[in-house]
Amino acid sequence: MSNCAIVGINWGDEGKGRMVDLLTSDYDVVVRYQGGGNAGHTVVNEKGKFALHLLPSGIFRSGVVNVLGNGVALDCENLWTEMQDVISKGVSITPENLKISDRASLLLPWHRELDGLEEARLADKKYGSTRQGIAPFYSDKYQKKTVMAGELLYPDKLWEHLEGILEWKNLTLERVYGAKPHTMEDLKAWVADFGEKIKPFICDTGAFLRQASKEGKNILFEAQLGSLRDLDYGIYPMTTSSNPIAAYAPVGSGYPEAKIDKIVGVVKAYSSCVGEGPFTCEWFGEEAEKLREAGGEYGAKTGRPRRVGPIDIVATRYGIQCQGATDIALTKLDVLSYLDEIPICARYELGGEQIDYFPFPAILPDAKPVMTSMPGWKCDISGVRKWEDLPEAARNYVEYVERQVGCRITYVSVGPERDSIIIR
C-alpha cells in the first residue's frame, strides 16, 4: 500500500492534472480533497482534451475509483455538466468509479450570486475571483450555514435545515446587496434537478478509503491550485478559501488518519498566475504575450489570459517547503524552446538587500526580482523521452533549478500528451 499526494507548488495551473493522469496507472483510488469549480485541471489523452474542475483526473482510467472528499465545495450543477461532457466522449461514470462524500458541503444557488455581487462591490479592490461561489461557500461552511451532501438522502431533515439557512441568507442578499431573495420553491426545484442526479454517488467515503487501505490499495490525493494560493500559507488575502497543501489531504479526503508516503510537487518551467495580487517576476507587453502564446496560458475555467514570467526560485522554494514535497515534476519545459536565453528570478531585492526567503504577504509587493539567465536550447524537445537525449542546455537548466530549490526533479514534461514525460 502506498499513498501519494500530487500538489501545486506555485499559483496553480502547474500541470497537476496531467501528472495525476500519468501516475494513476500505479494507483487504485484518486481523491480530490479541497476546492471546487474555481480552477481547472487540463488532461489530454486518447479521448480528447478535458478541463476538469471537480471530477478527479483519474476518471479516465479503467479500474480506478474516484472520490470527492468532504473538503470539496460540492457544486452539483457544474459537477453534473462536467460528468455529461466526459460521458459524451465515451468515458463511463457510475457509482462504482465515482464516490461523493456524504460529508461534503453543498455549494448552494446563492453562493455564485454572492461572489459576483461582492466582486462588483469591491470594484478596483476586487480579489480577481472566478465567481464560482468559492469564498461565500467556505465562509458559510465555517459559519455552519450550508448543508452536507448526505442530507439529500433525508429530505425532511434537509428542508428543515435549509429553511433556517434561507432566512439568514436572504437578509444578506436584500440588506447588504439589494438583491432579490431566494424562496424555498427555488431551492426545492434546484434539489429536484441537480441534487437528485448526484444522490446515487453519495456514500461514506471515509469508510470506503479505510477499507481500500486495509486491502492494500494505493491511494492518490489530488490537490487544486497551489501553495501560494493556500488560505494559511499563501499570499493572503489573494488566496483561495481552502488549503491546497498536502497536509490537508487526509482531513479533506475523509480519511484523517491516512499517512502520505510521497508528495509530488508540480512546478511549471516558468511562472504563471490567474487573479490579482503580487507576482514579483511578472512580464508585460510583447515579452509576456510571446510566452503566453507559446504556453497556451489562458485559464481553464475562465479563459482569462494568465499573467506570466520566468521561473521564480524564491517562491518555488517556499512552495516546496509548504508542501513538504519529496519529488518535483517540472512541466512545460518544451515551451521555453523559443528563447535564446532562459531568464530566472534567482533572488529578491527588498529594502535595499538581496534576500532568498519569501517575504510576509504585506511587504511582498515591495520585492523586486533579481535576475540571472542560462543559455537556451532553441530546438523542439517535444519528442524526447530519455533524459540523456535532451539538449545539454535543457539538462543544465533542470539541474540548476533542482539545486536551487533543494528537491529532486523526478519528472520532466515536454508536451501535453500522456506520454510526453521524462522520468529521471
Region locations from a protein language model:
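Non-transmembrane, aqueous-exposed alpha-helical and coiled segments at domain scale
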Residues: 1-424
